[in-house]
Amino acid sequence: MLIYKKQIKIYFYIFLTIHLILWTLIPSLTNNNLPLDTIEALAWGSNLDWGFNKHPPMSAFIVEIFYNIFGSNDWAYYLLSQIFIIFSFFVVFQFSKEILNNEILALISVLLLEGIYFYNFTTPEFNVNVCQIPFWVLTVYYSWKVFNQKIPKLKDCVIVGVFAVGGFLS
């Protein structure tokens, strides 16, 4: 069976959609309360300090933004968590395509990530672990771009710095 490049992207987007829907819908229907770390981030978000006794501020900042948009709807925080994860999957897919020069292997690399505990069962709880994933994925991706260039572009170096700072603040 031949799989064409357009089909790989379709399979990838189907996978992202299924992941987003399942990992948003199931906790929304089965959990009575938000996870404790998400509630903690909501409490911290009301202060918007530059750090807290347990964690850096990024997760509280982002949860506060979502609270201002969606209010106290629990499903929104499960959705927020999955947005961070599927965005990370998207960056890993792009990174894998560039490294491996093969879209099938790039898709397999993302599907293998789905098998890692931190990309599935723990993702409904928006906490610092979920918050930092896209920042570190982007830091690695742009670091690879910088190291792969004969003469690094200033723009790419600044982007690495911005995403690394986002990772540290997560």
Question: Which role does the model predict for each range below?
Answer:
Residues K97-L100, T139-C157:
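Membrane-interface transmembrane helices that cradle and orient dolichyl/undecaprenyl
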Residues F121-C131:
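Short acidic/glycine- and proline-prone juxtamembrane loop motifs at membrane-interface regions
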Residues V63-Y67, L80-V91, I116, Q132-F135:
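Transmembrane alpha-helices of multi-pass, membrane-embedded glycan-processing enzymes
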Residues N47, K155-S170:
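Membrane-interface alpha helices of multi-pass inner-membrane proteins
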Residues M1-W23:
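Start-transfer (signal-anchor) and selected internal transmembrane alpha helices
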Residues I26-A41, W50-I65, G71-A76:
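Extracytoplasmic catalytic/substrate-binding loops of multi-pass membrane glycan-assembly enzymes
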Residues A106-E114, A164, F168:
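Short helix- or helix-capping micro-motifs
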Residues Q82-I86, S109, N129-S143, C157-V160:
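Alpha-helical transmembrane segments of multi-pass membrane proteins
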